[in-house]
Amino acid sequence: YDELHCHVRAKLGDVYGEDNVPQDGPIPAHLLGNMWSQQWGTLYDLMEPYPGVGDIDVDATLKAKDFSPKEMVRSAESFYASLGMPRLPDTFWERSQFSRPQDREVDCYASAWGMDGGNDVRIKMCINQTYDELRVIYHELGHNYYQRAYKDQPPLFQGAAHDGFHEAIGDAIVLSI
């Protein structure tokens, strides 16, 4: 991470000048896509590792293979399982919302839920076949796996020590896809 940070800071210093991006300090957040420095995708043109080679079109692949929303979630579950984490419980698959219901209005903003402080974890999304949505799925499952990791703790400890840690888990996993 330190090397990546140093590389990005140096490139930004070349573009914006060392007065704006000091080489011995943090990268100014407003140069990293949003004020929380979460979305570095806006830097891709500057950081592209192999200019001119072209991108992998994940959206087209998802559509060509006709991945359903549930299959997209299963791929994320398989990734977490490959890290030694348990498969999601059957209730997750029965009670989560993966697609927009046709019979009622719903809020489709993606969210993860730990319903009982135990194994009843869920996500609520209206999943489309896009790479961005796939990334959100991996992120939201990060919340669910973290919820399951602390389910056996006393109630006082059944939560993140800091809300940012919940976000960091999903965001760190998303870097792996």
PLM segments and residue spans:
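Cation-handling catalytic/transport regions enriched in His/Asp/Glu
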Residues: 1-177
